[in-house]
Curated annotation (Swiss-Prot):
Post-translational modification Phosphoserine, affected residues: 10
KW Lipid metabolism (keyword) present: no
Residue ranges, annotated region (Interaction with CDK2): 51-91
Name of the protein this chain belongs to: Cyclin-dependent kinase inhibitor 1B
Homology family: Belongs to the CDI family.
Residue span of motif Nuclear localization signal: 153-169
Organism per entry: Mus musculus (Mouse)
Name of the gene encoding the protein in the UniProt record: Cdkn1b
GO biological process: apoptotic process; autophagic cell death; cellular response to antibiotic; cellular response to lithium ion; epithelial cell apoptotic process; epithelial cell proliferation involved in prostate gland development; G1/S transition of mitotic cell cycle; heart development
């Protein structure tokens, strides 16, 4: 039994449980600024977006909805795609969450990953034939491996044998003929640090 005492000034535990069950406390964040009127919030957001769009049209004399230039102080002209830096026309990178999803999808049931071609100096002659067989990197999740730094380029080691996990056994137990001799482990001790008695 414990030596915990409940003072007379505090309510008993039974009364506390009953009070919580009857009237659950409302969340403070829900009522901090009053109830949310979703219709009004949507109207305000749409109005704000329209105002921003109109201000941008006036400032840049360009109709961003229809992608057409308007009359004004700026003169818009078309340019060739090749004359622009690459970042203006390359597709956007997938979000980091997409990398995690692609990594999970590219594993088969046994846990091994599909073959992923290596890019640039990392590729050797055996890996280059994979690049020729792949139709389009946008359709293939493995083609996004160079864009997703979290994906592995080769599968994890399949054999996690006892090579990596060494057991420190005493010589007496190993030379012993008993069936459990190989399962005894002993914590290694530093040589030379013996107690002086």
């Amino acid at each position: 039994m414990s030596n915990v005492r409940v003072s007379n000034g505090s309510p008993s535990l039974e009364r506390m449980d009953a009070r919580q069950a009857e009237h659950p406390k409302p969340s403070a964040c829900r009522n901090l600024f009053g109830p949310v009127n979703h219709e009004e919030l949507t109207r305000d957001l749409e109005k704000h977006c329209r105002d921003m769009e109109e201000a941008s049209q006036r400032k840049w004399n360009f109709d961003f909805q229809n992608h057409k230039p308007l009359e004004g102080r700026y003169e818009w002209q078309e340019v060739e795609r090749g004359s622009l830096p690459e970042f203006y026309y390359r597709p956007p990178r997938p979000p980091k969450s997409a990398c995690k999803v692609l990594a999970q999808e590219s594993q088969d049931v046994s846990g091994s990953r599909q073959a992923v071609p290596l890019i640039g100096s990392q590729a050797n002659s055996e890996d280059r034939h994979l690049v020729d067989q792949m139709p389009d990197s946008s359709d293939n999740p493995a083609g996004l491996a160079e864009q997703c730094p979290g994906m592995r380029k080769r599968p994890a080691a399949e054999d996690s044998s006892s090579q990596n996990k060494r057991a420190n056994r005493t010589e007496e137990n190993v030379s012993d003929g008993s069936p459990n001799a190989g399962t005894v482990e002993q914590t290694p001790k530093k040589p030379g640090l013996r107690r002086q008695t």
